[in-house]
Amino acid sequence: MASSNLIKQLQERGLVAQVTDEDALAERLAQGPVALYCGFDPTADSLHLGHLVPLLCLKRFQQAGHKPVALVGGATGLIGDPSFKAAERKLNTEETVQEWVAKIRKQVAPFLDFDCGENSAIAANNYDWFGSMNVLTFLRDIGKHFSVNQMINKEAVKQRLNRDDQGISFTEFSYNLLQGYDFACLNKLHGVALQIGGSDQWGNITSGIDLTRRLHQNQVFGLTVPLITKADGTKFGKTEGGAVWLDPKKTSPYKFYQFWINTADADVYRFLKFFTFMDIEEINALEEEDKNSGKAPRAQYVLAEQVTRLVHGEEGLVAAKRITECLFSGSLSALSEADFEQLAQDGVPMVEMEKGADLMQALVDAELQPSRGQARKTIASNAVTINGEKQSDPEYIFNDEDRLFGRYTLLRRGKKNYCLICWK
């Protein structure tokens, strides 16, 4: 992405929700490398899909020659951002937040290049400047620059202020000052001139721009990326099991890959623009090809492949594709023990059973059939496989050969109903 028309290119991808003084920012970016930052608060022990668009945006700026600063909020994570939240967040302990800071820092690192000369990325933690600040300094040096009148008129907190049942604590109300000071601080420390974030962060970003101007007399900018929505109106980045996480221990690479494979046709080309580094021309050509092929679209496979590789690397992608292929074909011989661990984690429904169980009981325990009677009929009708092999004997009792790697047996009823038995 050439720097001179970077904003235009981001707009073509649908990646710009709001931007302050667009012409001045475009001019500033055209003059040479700019330091920019995005903040990630440790509200859990992993980032999730909602964080991916701003994180990839940092990467897009770095690829265009700019210097990204990834800020993990060791201090702001202790307070909690009230922006567009219906209720007060639960406060986490300092130990928990510090632990999460370390994990999120590690997660962010592979997306950016920390060793590429002039525009090498920087990792920052706002606990470094807030941890030792006393309350008088905070109120005198930061608080006096903020107008409460303006703060209560910010859209992000308006809904909370108007609700009798919830309201907002002084703790969360002060969050805006903390994030505002982050921008001013990073401007002084690293010359940061641009903050990016999700569109829910607009109020916090504009506060930071204002504070930086007041404290350092510098012009700085803000740009937000849209919060991702799906064409059908349902929430993006959620499955029945909850959020889709970037940590493979919380969402396996197989489940992650499947999430993208299941993208609706109405969303997939937009998501290719948001979540991949493919050229717009390439994405448009793929859309055209899918429209005219008369076959199932290829776009979902391209999207799943690109994003899984970005987040889980080549190894994670290869494993996810291998598991997908084996489940589709019914032949499990290529699956490794680690693949079965992914399936047990969240890939297919899982049930633990004692050795000596029979097939009918397994189908009932696995919720593949409601009763032993129904299970008997299903087995007799040749609709059940054990590890890919058909089994039509209703009295069948599992043996050691059925226990792959000593503990896994994959049951299938019909074409698509799976359950993994983990033997105790």
Swiss-Prot record:
Cystine residue pairs: none
Protein function: Catalyzes the attachment of tyrosine to tRNA(Tyr) in a two-step reaction: tyrosine is first activated by ATP to form Tyr-AMP and then transferred to the acceptor end of tRNA(Tyr).
Assembly description: Homodimer.
Cross-referenced PROSITE patterns: AA_TRNA_LIGASE_I, S4
Subcellular location: Cytoplasm
Biological processes annotated in GO: tyrosyl-tRNA aminoacylation
A GO cellular-component term linked to this record: cytosol
Name by which UniProt lists this protein: Tyrosine--tRNA ligase
Keyword Protein biosynthesis among record annotations: yes
Single Gene Ontology MF annotation: RNA binding
Family of this protein: Belongs to the class-I aminoacyl-tRNA synthetase family. TyrS type 1 subfamily.
Short motif ('KMSKS' region): ranges: 235-239
Membrane-spanning residues: none
Family matches, as HAMAP family: Tyr_tRNA_synth_type1
Catalytic activity, EC: 6.1.1.1
Keywords: Aminoacyl-tRNA synthetase, ATP-binding, Cytoplasm, Ligase, Nucleotide-binding, Protein biosynthesis, RNA-binding
Record field: catalytic activity: tRNA(Tyr) + L-tyrosine + ATP = L-tyrosyl-tRNA(Tyr) + AMP + diphosphate + H(+)
S4 RNA-binding domain location: 357-414
Highest taxon above the source species: Bacteria
Residues that bind ATP: K238
Entries under InterPro entries matching the protein: aa-tRNA-synth_I_CS, aa-tRNA-synth_Ic, Rossmann-like_a/b/a_fold, S4_RNA-bd, S4_RNA-bd_sf, SYY-like_C, Tyr-tRNA-ligase, Tyr-tRNA-ligase_bac-type
Residues that bind L-tyrosine: Y37, Y175, Q179
Motif 'HIGH' region in this chain: 42-51
Source lineage: Bacteria, Pseudomonadati, Pseudomonadota, Gammaproteobacteria, Enterobacterales
